[in-house]
């Protein structure tokens, strides 16, 4: 299992619309095959910056999601809200303490 982190920065005027869209689509994204967890974070000092953390069983499952109609439609709309280029990382968790 690995974590996909995506950093997105939005024009202020689009933040509410992005959050509404995420609220509407989050369960569909989370229910994608291989997705084990989905989280959305907002930067505390710059409210235009958001991060998604999604936990995936394997690379194949993430790629299958990224090629799905769900992803294509959500990403096409999300891209219109950006004020900067998004960044994404696939990372392996090394240590987790509770």
Identify the meaning behind each predicted range.
Residues 1-4, 15, 26, 39-41, ...:
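Short acidic/polar alpha-helix capping motifs at helix-coil junctions
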Residues 2-4, 34, 38, 67, ...:
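Anionic, Ser/Thr-rich low-complexity intrinsically disordered regions
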Residues 2-9, 39-66:
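Short, well-ordered beta-strand segments in beta-rich or mixed alpha/beta enzyme
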Residues 10-12, 58, 92-95:
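Non-catalytic surface loops within mature trypsin-like serine protease
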Residues 12, 65-68, 85:
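Residues at alpha-helix boundaries and the short loops/turns that link adjacent helices
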Residues 14-37, 70-75:
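Short amphipathic alpha-helical segments
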Residues 30, 57, 83:
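Short conserved AdoMet
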Residues 39-48, 76-98:
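Glycine-rich beta-strand-turn "strand-cap" elements at beta-sheet edges
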């Amino acid at each position: 299992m690995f974590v996909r982190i995506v950093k997105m920065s939005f024009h202020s005027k689009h933040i509410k619309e992005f959050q509404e869209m995420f609220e509407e689509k989050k369960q569909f994204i989370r229910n994608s095959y291989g997705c084990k967890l989905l989280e959305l974070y907002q930067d505390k000092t710059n409210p235009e910056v958001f991060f998604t953390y999604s936990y995936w069983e394997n690379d194949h499952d993430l790629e299958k999601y990224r090629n799905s109609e769900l992803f294509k439609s959500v990403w096409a709309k999300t891209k219109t809200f950006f004020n900067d280029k998004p960044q994404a990382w696939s990372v392996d968790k090394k240590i987790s303490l509770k």
